[in-house]
Amino acid sequence: MSLPLPMSPGRSGFTPKLELSYDSGPGNGIFGFGWKLETSEITRKTDKGLPQYCDSDESDVFILSGLEDLVPILDATGARMMLPRTVYGTSYRISFYRPRIGGLFARIERWVAKDTGISHWRSLSRDNVTTLYRYDPTSRVADPTDPTKIFSRRISRSWDAKGNAAAYSYADEYGAGINQALAAEADRTAATCAVQTYLKTIQYGNLEPYFPGWTAATEAGLPSDWMFLAVLDYGDHGASPPTPTSDQPWPVRPEPFSTCRAGFEIRTYRRVQRFLFFNNFPQEPTSGANCLARSLDLVYSDQQAPADPRNPIYTFLVSATETGYRHDSGTLVTRSMPALEFAYSQPQIQPGVLSLDRESLGNLPEGLDGTRFSQLDGAISTIIADH
């Protein structure tokens, strides 16, 4: 199940292709249980164990966007192919990777700064689109005690051969609204709470072409004349009319959750309430600068049924509504499409204790002395026999 975001089309078809997708496997996220936003990132594989973060020994397997394992490219002697390069006054060691299964046809590079050991990644697609991962400090998830142990490198920016570019910005977790008096938060410090970062804005549709000069002494920086802006509202934007700038306190979701697959705790306190899409045409009298064009409003199960006892444990996305906006003589006119509603198969839990007749115990395993000890393990079905 997928839900494409209503992004305004960019020039030459260069538009971030983003969609919400549902899969019951990944668990909870910033869109409730099962939903996630399909964005590009490079992360460490955790299916067979915790990451070791010994990158010089290739102790971990990297994954591109959760799909393909990346393997290092070797030279004729069997050693890793590496290339030194200095860009913007920083010396790097560049190593090269390719997907384990062919078909992506992309050049994938890991750039490690010689002086700090901090790395970022770069990929060049077969369509000549360059993408940088963890190029900005906030586009990563790292160990709070060691910033060189980066678990996930998220997309920072991308551009094509025609000068079209897109920039992604992230918001750091800063602990606003967290009730430290709760038992679940008692042993957490400000540093451990601030590991998670949240995608906040996506800018694209630059007026001036973007061609970064890798041989220049200093970096020119990203364009500032973006025509389109997508904002993820975590409840920190006003209701009517919302603006691109956060102007409300950051609310805490009803069921914060943690994952420790990175080898350290990554705790998520926020949840996306809606997407806001702005057009920036200052010369247009009917539009102007940062004009709200449309939104995608999300409703969760705890908002639909506040008294549901499952709310402190998990919440589901139950509806998504696309709304269009038009500015008419200073008045904001809105019109919404019918809501897209979602229903889920709920687990059937048997809270009672049932009795089993003696005739049905004949084929149950027993110990040598006729006594069987059982471990009561959560909701797993268990039979307790008394001899």
List the predicted regions and their residue ranges.
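Conserved catalytic cores of ATP-dependent inositol ring kinases
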Residues: 1-387
